Swiss-Prot record:
UniProt-recorded name of the protein: Inactive ubiquitin carboxyl-terminal hydrolase 17-like protein 7
Entry's Gene Ontology molecular function annotations: cysteine-type deubiquitinase activity
GO cellular component, one term: cytosol
Basic residues biased stretches: 513-524
Family indicated by similarity: Belongs to the peptidase C19 family. USP17 subfamily.
Positions of the USP domain: 80-375
Cellular compartment(s): Nucleus; Endoplasmic reticulum
One example of a Gene Ontology biological process annotation: regulation of apoptotic process
Region Disordered, annotated ranges: 382-412, 431-454, 490-530
PANTHER family: INACTIVE UBIQUITIN CARBOXYL-TERMINAL HYDROLASE 17-LIKE PROTEIN 4-RELATED (PTHR24006:SF651), UBIQUITIN CARBOXYL-TERMINAL HYDROLASE (PTHR24006)
Gene3D superfamilies noted in UniProt: Cysteine proteinases
InterPro entries: Papain-like_cys_pep_sf, Peptidase_C19, Peptidase_C19_UCH, USP_CS, USP_dom
Composition bias, Polar residues: 490-512
Length: 530
């Protein structure tokens, strides 16, 4: 992995040879650095003292550092499948992985009030909140994501799912910023999104002649792993943090010797993210060809060996989502994902098809993006449902009192604007009504011989159907606030050989895929509505 890929935002360079008054982190992060910079050198004691004295709290804390709110309104079962229109499966697969990111979705499902949203109708955070709420409260159904989600990204071609994923995360992060133009980098890194997905790399340079030390801290939202010579995620991580010798042309300029000097460079993690996104670099930046090789990844990963502070106990992450690309290059193919619902069952999310699966199938994929969450965070958010009330989907209990959108408040800047809530959800749900869906379905109905997702009339005796396909009777319009007569999920968890088809929707565009141009380095701009 190239070093430049680590610079995803502003960086703070703590050089032990000079005092940089412009480099300030918040007090909590400064405390971590006091204990992590323990190298012994002739200059380390004095410079470390100056460094710590110079640190100050951030100008503005955009989100509280205490634990994120929990939600007892989250159904424990799996949510809806997503309808595919054209080459938008890269959108669907990214949305599903974000929907089952517990700290994010539970925050959006909470009913806490906050300030007025400054982005109004073009707020990506509000649009995602409406989608996640709708998807999680529509188990057994197929919904169509709002076109607003990809308005600033989609070009009518097949795009890269990881690019869209990070585009969406970054857009939500920007939506969390208050309506002030002047904000320092440190304040921007205190948003809700950065607290969930973000942390810091510590790049430490040790000069071999004078024994000086220079540290640079770079924020990140995901970690790219070079798998060219790695057979597992563990090997890829070890290669990433392995000390590198810097000699000759690669020598670093020493602030004490005032010349280039041999040095060693080491990457470690001074802070840990609640959610860890690992992207496996499968595609060539030049040709777009895919590196189709099996890379082993575990369901649990201890990240303590890669932390700046050692011997502080295990830091266990658990796998909760896997994004998979099926194909031979980034220009074509198909995306699907595996996600773990809050009750612990794994599901394969392939556009409209939602199929129960097992951990063996999950771990045998040629993964493209891996999603891990700290074990303590998973347990905390999972227990919130059982503590409040029995996990359920919107159903019989809602007959007497339907859940209205006014009740689905969120701890986000647009919670006190009910008109915006109504508009966003109405806009999202209108795109999936029967009238909008039936006409293109009749015009573009796939021929039987090309229907690769055709469901046979006779099912094996060991298959348990959670809900029937909506295709034959037409897709109904389901809203989060409407009551639903939904079938309860069986408590029996099938094995990999007992996969369950939980719904299917025929492709509106057939199974052919358009080719995709190489947009790896193209810039994206967020849509702004007037």
């Amino acid at each position: 992995m190239e070093d430049d890929s680590l610079y995803l935002g502003g960086d703070w360079q703590f050089n032990h040879f000079s005092k940089l008054t412009s480099s300030r982190l918040d007090a909590a992060f400064a405390e971590i650095q006091r204990t992590s910079l323990s190298e012994k050198s002739p200059l380390s004691s004095e410079t470390r003292f100056d460094l710590c004295d110079d640190l100050a709290p951030v100008a503005r804390q955009l989100a509280p550092r205490e634990k994120l709110p929990l939600s007892s309104r989250r159904p424990a079962a799996v949510g809806a499948g997503l309808q595919k229109i054209g080459n938008t499966f890269y959108v669907n697969v990214s949305l599903q992985c974000l929907t089952y990111t517990l700290p994010l979705s539970n925050y959006m499902l909470s009913r806490e009030d906050s300030q007025t949203c400054h982005l109004h109708k073009c707020c990506m955070f509000c649009t995602m909140q409406a989608h996640i709420t709708w998807a999680l409260h529509s188990p057994g159904h197929v919904i169509q994501p709002s076109q607003v989600l990809a308005a600033g990204f989609h070009r009518g071609e097949q795009e890269d799912a990881h690019e869209f994923l990070m585009f969406t995360v970054d857009a939500m992060k920007k939506a969390c910023l208050p309506g002030h133009k002047q904000l320092d980098h440190h304040s921007k890194d205190t948003t809700l999104i950065h607290q969930i997905f973000g942390a810091y790399w510590r790049s430490q340079i040790k000069y071999l002649h004078c024994h000086g030390v220079s540290d640079t801290f770079d924020p990140y939202l995901d970690i790219a792993l070079d798998i060219q010579a790695a057979q597992s995620v563990k090997q890829a991580l070890e290669q990433l943090v392995k000390p590198k010798e810097l000699n000759g042309e690669n020598a670093y300029h020493c602030g004490l010797c005032l010349q280039k000097a041999p040095a060693s460079k080491t990457l470690t993690l001074p802070t840990s993210a609640k959610v860890l996104i690992l992207v496996l670099k499968r595609f060539s930046d030049v040709t777009g060809n895919k590196l189709a090789k099996n890379v082993q990844y575990p369901k649990c990963r201890d990240m303590q060996p890669y932390m700046s502070q050692q011997n502080t106990g295990p830091l266990v992450y658990v796998l909760y989502a896997v994004l998979v690309h099926a194909g031979w290059s980034c220009h074509n193919g198909h995306y699907f994902s595996y996600v773990k619902a809050q009750e612990g069952q794994w599901y394969k999310m392939d556009d409209a098809e939602v199929t129960a699966s097992g951990i063996t199938s999950v771990l045998s994929q040629q993964a493209y993006v891996l999603f891990y969450i700290q074990k303590s965070e998973w347990e905390r958010h999972s227990e919130s449902v059982s503590r409040g009330r029995e996990p359920r989907a919107l159903g019989a209990e809602d007959t007497d009192r339907p859940a209205t959108q006014g009740e689905l408040k969120r701890d986000h800047p647009c919670l006190q604007v009910p008109e915006l809530d109504e508009h966003l959800v109405e806009r999202a749900t209108q795109e999936s009504t029967l009238d909008h869906w039936k006409f293109p379905q009749e015009q573009n109905k796939t021929k039987p011989e090309f229907n690769v997702r055709k469901v046979e009339g006779t099912l094996p005796p060991n298959v348990l159907v959670i809900h029937q396909s909506k295709y034959k009777c037409g897709m109904k319009n389901h809203h989060p606030e409407q009551q639903s007569s939904l079938l309860n999920l069986s408590s029996t968890k099938p094995t990999d050989q007992e996969s369950m088809n939980t719904g299917t929707l025929a492709s509106l565009q057939g199974s052919t895929r358009r080719s995709k141009g190489n947009n790896k380095h193209s810039k994206r701009s967020l849509l702004v509505c007037q």
